[in-house]
Amino acid sequence: MDLLLKNGYVVDSASGFEGKADILIHDNRIREVGEDISAPEAQTVDCAGLTVIPGICDMHVHFRDPGQTHKEDIITGGNAAAAGGVTAVACMPNTNPTIDNAETVHYILEKAKEAKTRVYPVGSITKGLGGAEMCDFEELHKAGCVAVSDDGRPVKNARIMAEAMVKAHYAGMKVISHCEDLDIVNGGIMNYGEVSKELGVKGIHRLSEDIITEREITLAADLEVPIHIAHVSTAQSMQNIRTAARFGTMVTCETAPHYFMLTDELLRSRDADYRMNPPLRTAADVQAITEGVIDSTIDCIITDHAPHAPEEKADFEKAPNGVVGLETSLAATLTALYHTGKISLQRLVTLMCVNPRRILSIPGGSLRPGDIADICIFDPNEEWVVDPAKLHSKSKNTCFKGMTLKGRVKYTVLDGKIVYTDGID
């Protein structure tokens, strides 16, 4: 059956269109965009008062599948994605076994056929994330990987990283770099600063991120190949990326809503749900990241969706790093950046829908006739309080718990079919 979205406010930065319009979907593709479309036989959704954008692409998630499915799996992760208007994700390789071979890639893609989002695997740079033996990038790309990364760990050896960047480029993939000097981290669990000192816990100096970010930029510039910097959180890394991009280095980067909304002051609660990697930084860093979003230094907003079971998050100092984010990313971005006048809806769509797909060279991200019908429909003005118990993710470790966010996903369309309706599990 055809699907007709009536009276919505359509925002499509890929085409530049913004305004009231109807969208008619036939099979899995957009057939027509215009005013007063009539399709009596179609399933009709009244989108009056709602905003219609391309489905969001989150290019940085952890679905824990295979190997840690007590935290999340591809199906529950897909449910969380659909509830957040996310129709495509890139899942990181720190699974068990690692995504370092075609067999694991095939397992993920086969299971993802039943998920309520499109799942694109990211292969690992080195075997088992060990940092020593490089994977076969041609094999991974042929199997279905869209990028490579040792995310969760840095590639410590600069020679291996340089070789990986070149080989990935010629294999048709980007390297996504987790920028962290583990020797500087040295067991730290939160940002090094006044709060960590007052709490008496070991801090992570911002240099741990800045040094490796600068290394990756230098390699990209010298080798004349691309690099994508994951989850940027510090003011200095932001400035280094900005400067490099202006001088023509092929560097792109991403950040997550918690890095432009929250600070390490929240760690005073000694609640491990505010611990992630990289850690929450200072108000000055939040301002710098926000400026990077505004001036287009930052290309993408992602979540780094990292589920952990409640018992694993119980002990503040021993808990693993990571927070879930798929169901809050759009609302958090609307709250912090759109409703405060810092960015437009066009810019939001570019950050969350267009650029991630461009960087990964995957389809979607626009609402033109002929395009795949992956669509997010939301009420930009509806306020709601984040209740972890109501999240669709298997894990509930959200750093936005108890916060009031403005903007709520009402429907998600995947491949021409409604896969999520607000209020209906």
Please provide the spans of the model-predicted regions.
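Histidine/acidic residue-rich metal-binding segments in metalloenzymes
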Residues: 134-301
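Divalent metal-binding segments
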Residues: 62-71, 90-102, 122-134, 149-160, ...
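His/Asp/Glu-enriched, well-ordered alpha-helical/loop segment
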Residues: 198-226, 273, 294-301, 306-381
